[in-house]
Regions:
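Glycine-rich phosphate-binding active-site loops on the catalytic face of alpha/beta enzymes
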Residues: 24-36, 104-114, 157-167, 208-228
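Hydrophobic faces of well-ordered beta-strands that scaffold small-molecule active sites
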Residues: 27-29, 76-80, 105-107, 132-136, ...
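Glycine-enriched alpha-helix->loop->beta-strand junction motifs that scaffold or abut catalytic
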Residues: 23-25, 97-104, 125-132, 150-157, ...
Length: 255
C-alpha cells in the first residue's frame, strides 16, 4: 500500500514520524499547490493549510531528504503539479529530486501529448534516474494503454474513476481488460487510486489484478480529525493501514 500526504502542514515533523510508523509499503509526498485541479476537497484543504503554514517546494524537498536519511530503502514518490515542476527547469527539478532521494514523480496535470518515450520530460527524468509515473484513466482506449505502457517506468497510476481525488465518491474497479492490456504490453505494475478508502476497496482492487493501491484523502481525513490528539492520531493511522494491508493480503491468499 502506498500512502500520500501533503507536505508542509505546521505539524509536519511530528506527523511524518507518525506516518512512517504506520507500516505502509511506500510513501507519496504531495507538494501543496494553490490550484490542485486533480484533488478533491479534503486534500485541497490540506494544501491550503500547508501553504498558509509557509510550505513551498524547497521545504518539501527537505522533508523528502529527512525521510530518505531515516528510511534508505522505502520507496518514495513525489506528487507535484506541472507549473511547480517546470518553474526551476526540468533538468534542475529532476536533479534535485534525485539528490533528495525521490524515486518517482507523478504529475497529475501533465497533458498526455507531452508524454512520449522521447519527450523532454521523460528524458530529463531518465537522465537523473527518476521514474516519471504515467496515469491511465478508466476509459482509455486499448491503443492508448499500450502506448503508455510502452514508455512507463516504476508503476502506472490507474485511476479508478474520472474526476478528482477523495472519498466523497467511492472507487470504481478497473475492468480486468485494462489490466490485461497493460500486462501484455509489458507495463510496470498498476496501482489503483482515486476513492480508495475502505478495506473492501483494496480487496476488490487486488481481485481485479492490480498490484496495489494508492490511498491519500482517507489518510488526510484521519489527520484532520485528530490534530489535537496525538495518541489517537497514531492509533488510527496504524489501525487503518493494517486493516488495508490485511485486506490486500487476504485477497492475494484467496487467489
Amino acid at each position: 500500500e502506498r500512502i500520500g500526504c501533503s507536505a508542509g502542514i505546521p505539524i509536519i515533523e511530528e506527523l511524518k514520524a507518525r506516518l512512517e510508523s504506520t507500516g505502509a509499503d511506500a510513501f507519496e509526498l504531495g507538494i501543496p499547490f494553490s490550484d490542485p485541479s486533480a484533488d478533491g476537497p479534503v486534500i485541497c484543504i490540506s494544501s491550503k493549510r500547508a501553504l498558509a503554514g509557509g510550505s513551498n517546494t524547497r521545504k518539501c524537498m527537505d522533508v523528502a531528504r529527512q525521510f530518505r536519511r531515516h528510511h534508505p530503502d522505502v520507496p518514495l514518490s513525489l506528487m507535484i503539479y506541472i507549473n511547480l515542476a517546470y518553474a526551476p527547469g526540468l533538468d534542475n527539478f529532476f536533479e534535485e529530486c534525485r539528490e533528495a532521494g525521490i524515486d518517482a514523480v507523478l504529475i497529475p496535470d501533465i497533458p498526455s501529448t507531452m508524454r512520449a518515450a522521447e519527450s523532454e520530460w521523460d528524458s530529463a527524468a531518465r537522465n537523473h534516474d527518476v521514474q516519471l509515473i504515467s496515469l491511465v484513466p478508466p476509459n482509455a482506449a486499448d491503443e492508448k494503454i499500450r502506448e503508455i505502457s510502452g514508455h512507463s517506468e516504476g508503476y502506472i497510476y490507474l485511476m479508478s474513476r474520472n474526476g478528482v481525488t477523495g472519498t466523497d465518491r467511492a472507487a470504481c474497479m478497473p475492468p480486468s481488460h485494462i489490466v490485461n492490456v497493460m500486462r501484455v504490453a509489458g507495463a510496470p505494475p498498476a496501482l489503483l487510486g482515486f476513492g480508495i478508502s475502505k478495506p473492501e476497496h483494496v480487496a476488490d482492487a487486488m481481485r481485479h489484478g492490480v498490484a496495489g493501491v494508492v490511498v491519500g484523502s482517507a489518510y488526510v481525513r484521519i489527520i484532520n480529525e485528530n490534530l489535537d490528539d496525538d495518541e489517537a492520531l497514531h492509533r488510527k493511522l496504524s489501525e487503518f493501514t493494517q486493516n488495508m494491508k490485511a485486506a490486500a493480503k487476504g485477497a492475494l491468499l484467496a487467489e
